[in-house]
């Protein structure tokens, strides 16, 4: 079977073009998000002058926090976008809620925001999970 079922015999019948376009758009979105995540966290956490081939403890911790915060913000933006799709933007309420939650976390846990709903995932795990997610698209 070829990439995304194009040009080959599909045993389940003809592919729905809308599903194909949706799958391609989703793949583009996930790839773009991953690339922006890597670029942003690499720029913030890893010094330009490499002294070692491995991450030190501070770099690893910084990357873990950066990834967790990135996904937390991405989730919140998605929630606001979904409300916008329903015609109920509620941006002011959402901003106040996010600000209040961040302030509460800062008071409870110190100056770094404790992301409560995002599991701490190591960067190599994100790469692995992304490849597992993308593998059906690239390797079928």
UniProtKB/Swiss-Prot annotation:
Q: What would be an example GO MF term here?
A: metal ion binding
- State whether keyword Disulfide bond applies: yes
Q: Which InterPro entries match?
A: Tim10-like, Tim10-like_dom_sf
List cystine links. 41-66, 45-62
- Where in the cell does this protein reside? Mitochondrion inner membrane
GO terms classed as biological process: protein insertion into mitochondrial inner membrane
Source domain of life: Eukaryota
The topology of this chain with respect to the membrane is:
Peripheral membrane protein
| Gene Ontology cellular component terms for the protein in this record | mitochondrial inner membrane
Motif Twin CX3C motif, residue numbers: 41-66
What does this gene product do?
A: Mitochondrial intermembrane chaperone that participates in the import and insertion of multi-pass transmembrane proteins into the mitochondrial inner membrane. Also required for the transfer of beta-barrel precursors from the TOM complex to the sorting and assembly machinery (SAM complex) of the outer membrane. Acts as a chaperone-like protein that protects the hydrophobic precursors from aggregation and guide them through the mitochondrial intermembrane space.
Q: What is this protein called?
A: Mitochondrial import inner membrane translocase subunit TIM10
